[in-house]
């Protein structure tokens, strides 16, 4: 069991470094998919096969493939990106050091007084399935954080739609209020065209 744990953990670390250090964006996404697959392996070792399946279906099957298609469709100029990074190398290094120091501080000092065996923790038994156990915890002890997470995702989705929704000139749109306000008098027009001359252009209000 420990051999597989160290194997998956090592592969996740290597693939994560390759995601950051790879010069090709497509290769970075492929390494990211490989990291997700190894993460699913760790979930299986923990006995959470449902989470492993969700990690494969959602992250690999949807998110990572979406990233891959977007990167392949966009014209990515890596040399230009490297030039921009070199211009801000000092600032980027300073921010990276601050974040690294923050993570080390949280790991060393932030978890010192935390009791990981709380009232919420429970022992997985064979009486209920893994999916039922996760659902029971999510909708009882963690109901409020779970609903808040869904609300945050909903707000983010609405914000993305609002930012990308632009009114373009020259494009015809339906005005439902104006269409419903029409009646027989301003929709039906009776004409008596002259023979072999046709009807002139009619402008509707």
Curated annotation (Swiss-Prot):
Annotated source species: Rickettsia felis (strain ATCC VR-1525 / URRWXCal2) (Rickettsia azadi)
Keywords: Cell membrane, Membrane, NAD, Quinone, Translocase, Transmembrane, Transmembrane helix
Matching InterPro entries: NADH_UbQ/plastoQ_OxRdtase_su6 (IPR001457), Nuo/plastoQ_OxRdtase_6_NuoJ (IPR042106)
Bilayer-crossing regions: 1-21, 26-46, 54-74, 89-109, 142-162
Gene3D superfamilies in UniProt: NADH-ubiquinone/plastoquinone oxidoreductase chain 6, subunit NuoJ (1.20.120.1200)
Function field: NDH-1 shuttles electrons from NADH, via FMN and iron-sulfur (Fe-S) centers, to quinones in the respiratory chain. Couples the redox reaction to proton translocation (for every two electrons transferred, four hydrogen ions are translocated across the cytoplasmic membrane), and thus conserves the redox energy in a proton gradient.
Location within or outside the cell: Cell membrane
Family of the protein in this entry: Belongs to the complex I subunit 6 family.
Listed GO MF terms: NADH dehydrogenase (ubiquinone) activity; quinone binding
Protein's recorded name: NADH-quinone oxidoreductase subunit J
GO cellular component: plasma membrane
Catalysed reaction equations from the record: a quinone + NADH + 5 H(+)(in) = a quinol + NAD(+) + 4 H(+)(out)
Topology of this chain in the membrane: Multi-pass membrane protein
Primary location group: membrane
EC numbers for this chain: 7.1.1.-
Pfam family name, one: Oxidored_q3
């Amino acid at each position: 069991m420990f051999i597989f744990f160290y194997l998956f953990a090592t592969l996740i670390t290597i693939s994560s470094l390759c995601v950051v250090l790879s010069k090709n964006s497509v290769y970075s996404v492929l390494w990211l998919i490989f990291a997700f697959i190894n993460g699913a392996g760790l979930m299986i070792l923990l006995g959470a096969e449902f989470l492993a399946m969700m990690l494969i279906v959602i992250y690999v099957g949807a998110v990572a493939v979406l990233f891959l298609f977007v990167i392949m469709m966009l014209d990515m100029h890596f040399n230009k990106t490297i030039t921009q990074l070199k211009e801000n190398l000092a600032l980027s290094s300073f921010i990276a050091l601050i974040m690294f120091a923050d993570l080390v501080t949280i790991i060393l000092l932030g978890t010192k007084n935390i009791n990981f065996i709380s009232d919420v923790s429970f022992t997985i038994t064979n009486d209920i399935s893994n999916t039922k156990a996760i659902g029971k915890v999510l909708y009882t002890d963690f109901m409020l954080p779970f609903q808040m997470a869904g609300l945050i995702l909903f707000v983010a989705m609405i914000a993305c739609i609002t930012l990308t929704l632009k009114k373009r000139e020259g494009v015809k749109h339906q005005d439902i209020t104006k269409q419903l306000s029409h009646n027989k008098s301003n929709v039906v027009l009776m004409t008596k065209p002259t023979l072999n001359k046709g009807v002139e252009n009619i402008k509707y209000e």
